[in-house]
């Protein structure tokens, strides 16, 4: 698998962002509300105009059509969109093991999206994304609506998958404990730049 490289990314207040994320590495991002965490992920996924570029292995973001780039470098926003009536219609392929690991039943694929809670949508948005076999993940506070037990359950499912598929991951997180559990490296947004913080103290 390929690593993810950010080269001179500029979006909003952020300027000249350089970052290399190795295959299978989780890099956590944190910072105050409004500092640009989500906008940075949107720039990397080519969902927002920006300066600079991103690379996945030897492929440059601007060298392929946006929809093709986003199939490889997939972003899971904090509030996911749903466009079909049922959960199963959103899955690229059946994901029974993932559903079970996250506490869902076999019938979940037939559930109406309208019955889902915010926490269920967050978990199922991750299942939906992984069903499409991306080559890199951009996660915007994917456990924000989950309690501690459910958060740990999601991490226990997702981290081995990241390692197995060797996915480079940018993960926006606020909680210090979660960052210590997940991150290979941690960067905090301060003004226009990323400042590396110690992961474990």
How does the language model describe each region?
Residues 45:
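Helix-to-loop junction immediately C-terminal to a conserved catalytic motif
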Residues 60-74:
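ABC ATPase NBD coupling module
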Residues 72, 79-98:
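Q-loop/switch helix immediately C-terminal to the Walker
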Residues 112-116, 120:
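Conserved ABC ATPase signature
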Residues 126:
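Hydrophobic anchor residue at the start of the ABC signature
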Residues 137-141:
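Catalytic Walker B motif of ABC-type/P-loop ATPase nucleotide-binding domains
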Residues 172-174:
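H-loop/switch region of ABC-family ATPase nucleotide-binding domains
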């Amino acid at each position: 698998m390929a690593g993810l490289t950010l080269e001179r990314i500029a979006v909003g207040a952020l300027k000249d962002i350089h970052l290399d994320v190795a295959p299978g590495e989780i890099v956590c991002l944190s910072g105050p509300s409004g500092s640009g965490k989500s906008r940075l992920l949107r720039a990397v996924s080519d969902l927002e105009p920006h300066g600079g570029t991103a690379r996945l292995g030897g492929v440059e973001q601007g060298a392929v059509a946006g929809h093709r780039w986003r199939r490889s470098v997939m972003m899971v926003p904090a509030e996911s969109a749903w466009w079909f009536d049922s959960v199963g219609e959103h899955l690229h392929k059946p994901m029974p093991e993932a559903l079970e690991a996250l506490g869902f039943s076999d019938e979940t694929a037939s559930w109406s999206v309208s019955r889902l809670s915010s926490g269920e949508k967050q978990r199922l948005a991750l299942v939906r994304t992984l069903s499409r076999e991306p080559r890199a993940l951009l996660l915007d506070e994917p456990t924000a609506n989950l309690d501690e037990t459910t958060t740990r359950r999601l991490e226990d499912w997702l981290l081995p998958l990241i390692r197995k598929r060797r996915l480079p991951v940018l993960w926006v997180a606020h909680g210090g404990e979660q960052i210590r559990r997940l991150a290979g490296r941690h960067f905090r947004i301060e003004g226009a730049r990323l400042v590396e913080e110690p992961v474990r103290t």
